[in-house]
């Protein structure tokens, strides 16, 4: 089960174990995009490693990509095994069996710096240090979201607009860093466009700083008259020395770590406010995106930044790209299985395969 997503949705692990635990010997949680949930107290129910489990519960495996938002070199990852509560039962997987299964797929010439990075990461988080690092980081990112909500009108963070009868940005930062109400997907809420989930099932990962740009009426699922494609904002930020993690049709993502300082985040906010001012002033594209303008001057000669946004937005709108993208992930639009993936893998290993162009697949 994928515990957390790239874009910042995270499961309630306790709820998963309560719902399906009795059906499983073990549950494997893929926590590649998280791994720090046990160091943020309000996220304790999202951490499979912090659950109190008994002999009737499943064993737990958790894998984490330490290199993403923790202190690890590229490719550094780790696997955790939590199953002392079922030791002695037939389903229990001993430590040596796990190690031998792992070694069957591991290199005998590993890069030892990766192991050193794991040790450094563990030491950094030892005792109360890990909690202090991450809770302070959460507060920093909360303040950044508040600044955007108060100062921007085209760009907003993906958070509930109102919590407990008060605007999100009017909440007390100390409380918000310790209360999952400010990060919850409540059933029936319309601000995010998701459907088909239960109370307490999903939360926003506070360390995935995602901004939504104008252009899509999320509550009604339709396009607005004007919009700012995420790619335009991403290129503007790169022009100004800020590298986003990724962008999509109408959003942009930053992965936050304890290394983020108030100074760095204030710089991001200032750049976003400046971008909106350039949109309102309909500044020349050559001023806002000089590198792209220079590379394609024949195409964009005389363009303004608002004109570019409108042209790209209309392209998406006329083709209903937002709906097409959403359909990619719906069951009714998935391709029909001709053969199951395991059987296909065996046939591939036997050489019974052919490389074809994507349009023929």
Each language-model region and where it sits:
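Conserved PLP-enzyme active-site core in the AAT-like
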Residues: 1-152
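Non-catalytic terminal extensions of PLP-dependent enzymes
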Residues: 128-361
């Amino acid at each position: 089960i994928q515990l957390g997503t790239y874009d910042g949705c995270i499961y309630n692990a306790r709820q998963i174990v309560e719902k399906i635990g009795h059906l499983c010997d073990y549950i494997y949680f893929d926590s590649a995009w998280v791994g720090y949930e046990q160091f943020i107290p309000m996220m304790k129910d999202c951490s499979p490693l912090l659950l109190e489990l008994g002999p009737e519960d499943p064993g737990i495996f958790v894998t984490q990509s330490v290199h993403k938002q923790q202190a690890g070199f590229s490719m550094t990852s780790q696997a955790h095994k939590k199953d002392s509560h079922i030791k002695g039962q037939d389903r229990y997987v001993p430590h040596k069996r796990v190690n031998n299964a792992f070694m069957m797929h591991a290199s005998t010439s590993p890069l030892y710096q990766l192991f050193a990075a794991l040790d450094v990461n563990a030491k950094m988080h030892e005792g109360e240090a890990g909690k202090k690092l991450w809770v302070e980081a959460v507060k920093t990112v909360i303040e950044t979201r508040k600044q955007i909500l108060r100062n921007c009108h085209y760009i907003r963070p993906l958070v509930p607009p109102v919590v407990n009868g008060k605007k999100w940005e009017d909440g007390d930062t100390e409380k918000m860093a310790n209360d999952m109400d400010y990060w919850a997907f409540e059933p029936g809420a319309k601000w995010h466009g998701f459907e088909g989930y239960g109370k307490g099932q999903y939360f926003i990962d506070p360390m995935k700083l995602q901004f939504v740009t104008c252009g899509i009426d999320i509550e009604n699922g339709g396009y607005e008259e004007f919009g700012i494609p995420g790619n335009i904002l991403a290129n503007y930020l790169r022009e100004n020395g800020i590298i986003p993690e990724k962008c999509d049709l109408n959003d942009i993502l930053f992965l936050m770590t304890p290394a983020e300082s108030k100074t760095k985040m204030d710089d991001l906010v200032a750049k976003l406010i400046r971008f909106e001012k350039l949109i309102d002033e309909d500044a020349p594209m050559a001023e806002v995106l000089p590198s792209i303008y220079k590379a394609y001057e024949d195409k964009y000669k005389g363009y303004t930044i608002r004109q570019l946004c409108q042209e790209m937005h209309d392209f998406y709108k006329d083709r209903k790209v937002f709906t097409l993208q959403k359909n990619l992930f719906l069951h009714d639009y998935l391709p029909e299985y001709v053969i199951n993936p395991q059987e296909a893998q065996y046939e591939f290993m036997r050489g019974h395969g052919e490389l074809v162009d994507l349009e023929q697949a």
